[in-house]
Amino acid sequence: MVRYRCCRSQSRSRCRRRRRRCRRRRRRCCQRRRVRKCCRRTYTLRCRRY
């Protein structure tokens, strides 16, 4: 199974708009590719494979 972790390439201002949604779901990072959801702590939008 491929996992993704947070990447800080996106601007935080865009991330803050989705802050509530992200906190509610409690996801640290995106689970799929190209899915724009904030990470739980850093609130970044993109994820990187690892």
UniProtKB/Swiss-Prot annotation:
Tissues expressing this chain: Testis.
Database matches in PROSITE patterns: PROTAMINE_P1 (PS00048)
GO molecular function, one term: DNA binding
Disulphide bond pairs: C7-C15, C39-C47
GO biological process: chromosome condensation; sperm DNA condensation
Swiss-Prot/TrEMBL keywords: Chromosome, Developmental protein, Differentiation, Disulfide bond, DNA condensation, DNA-binding, Nucleosome core, Nucleus, Spermatogenesis
CC annotations in GO: cytosol; nucleoplasm; nucleosome
Coiled coil regions in record: none
Location in or out of the cell: Nucleus; Chromosome
Pfam families: Protamine_P1
Principal place of residence: nucleus
Task performed by this protein: Protamines substitute for histones in the chromatin of sperm during the haploid phase of spermatogenesis. They compact sperm DNA into a highly condensed, stable and inactive complex.
Similarity remark: Belongs to the protamine P1 family.
Subunit structure: Cross-linked by interchain disulfide bonds around the DNA-helix.
Protein's UniProt name: Sperm protamine P1
